Amino acid sequence: MYKAAIFDMDGTILNTLGDLTDAINYAMKETGHKYGYNEKIVAHFFGSGVYVALKRALSVENRFPEDRLDLIGTPDEPDDCFKDDTEIERISKIYRPYYNAHCDVKTGPYPGILELMKKLRDRGIKTAVVSNKPDAAVQTLVSDKFPGAFNFSLGEKTGIKRKPAPDMVNECLRVLEIPRGECVYIGDSEVDFATGRNSGMHVISVDWGFRSHEYLASIPVEKIVSNADELYQEITR
């Protein structure tokens, strides 16, 4: 049994797609860009933070192939994606305050997640959230949706490298005071799998989030679960 479980947020414990989609469309519209994206495509924008999400949205606007979006924001980033950092930052200044003010409108926990957190606490397992979502939104959502459920939560902030770099997880482990070999990282994307591996931890991938079971299996990831009960069994076995 693991002594600590570290969770991603978007697509793992919370279905945030509705609010993320609204915020992307608002920011793009306000800055004169293409908007009206649906949740299916927005799911592929996110996973590596706001900057990469906006870069992917702008690349789609410029007819970048949707099936190559996951390469943007990685070391294998294509040369033909959107590259104007000044424009990305301009849109980000609209997106961030709007999302922080509207991050809890449509968002809610996935089935069984609240019960899972209680069962883990009852077993004495420490829990934490490490997300590339802006830290202000992470703290708001943890407080509103999971009061008292987590021992630690951390989102994207200045001065610490975002996932898949291990820095955020390392900070979490420092606070939890649990050896990394006794912790597991849980997420729904290729970024989460890389984060866990880069942090020297086992990884459990969930298939109810922003990436499909088939996509996760193609990486291939270490272990895939399809519901909260399966996840509990993997954490406590």
Residue ranges and their predicted role:
Residues M1-K3, K29, F64, R121, ...:
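Asp-based, Mg2+/Mn2+-dependent phosphohydrolase catalytic module
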Residues Y2-E115, R123, Q139:
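N-terminal helical cap/lid subdomain that shapes the substrate entry/recognition surface
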Residues I6-D8, V130, I186:
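Generic enzyme active-site microenvironment
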Residues T12, S131-K133:
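Conserved phosphate-coupling serine/threonine residues in phosphotransfer and NTP-handling enzymes
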Residues E87-I91, K133, A149:
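Extended, well-ordered alpha-helical scaffold segments
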Residues C103-T107, N132, H202:
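Short, flexible loop segments at the rims of nucleotide/cofactor-binding pockets, characterized by
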Residues P109, V130, K161:
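Residue-level marker of regulatory loop/turn positions in helix-turn-helix DNA-binding domains and
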